[in-house]
């Protein structure tokens, strides 16, 4: 939903170049334009949108007379099913991970969830055993037609996190 102006400012390119990029993007991925039009129409008709799991969000802004407010409602209608489904998925993963931590006798514990990211405190001697469980739990939280992949990092603090590849996990 970024405008040519917004893209030109962020990428430090001329607006015409930004618009050409946007046009090429939507021509290449035409399903995105279809989705955006369809979800806005559905939201206008029903007054709400839903996540894949059926959680609803009412969008009264779509009926606003103010065009700026109405445009904000359209952005909500486009983004909520995607972002809301991601939130649903991470919450499912959190519940299942907690169950697996308890069942496995782990001392590890979840500390924080930010968007689609989980931060855990894990004793060093549990890292190798927990990584495959964490990966499988998060990647299988909701079966979809596209694979969910997880990036796992380890470290003593956020500043020193090191990515852990699948090969690292297999070798452990």
Predicted features along the sequence, with ranges:
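Conserved catalytic core of nucleotide polymerization and phosphodiester-bond processing enzymes
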Residues: 1-172
């Amino acid at each position: 939903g970024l405008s040519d102006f917004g893209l030109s400012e962020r990428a430090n390119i001329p607006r015409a170049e930004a618009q050409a990029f946007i046009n090429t993007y939507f021509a290449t991925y035409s399903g995105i334009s279809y989705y955006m039009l369809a979800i806005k129409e559905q939201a206008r008709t029903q007054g709400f949108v839903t996540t894949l799991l059926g959680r609803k969000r009412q969008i009264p802004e779509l009926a606003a007379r103010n065009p700026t407010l109405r445009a904000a409602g359209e952005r909500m209608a486009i983004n909520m099913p995607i972002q809301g489904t991601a939130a649903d998925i991470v919450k499912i993963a959190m519940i299942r991970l907690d169950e697996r931590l308890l069942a496995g006798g782990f001392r590890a514990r979840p500390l924080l969830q930010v968007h689609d990211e989980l931060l855990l405190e894990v004793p060093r001697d549990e890292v190798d055993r927990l990584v495959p469980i964490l990966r499988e739990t998060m990647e299988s939280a909701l079966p979809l037609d596209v694979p969910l992949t997880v990036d796992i990092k380890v470290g003593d603090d956020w500043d020193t996190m090191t990515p852990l590849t699948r090969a690292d996990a297999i070798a452990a």
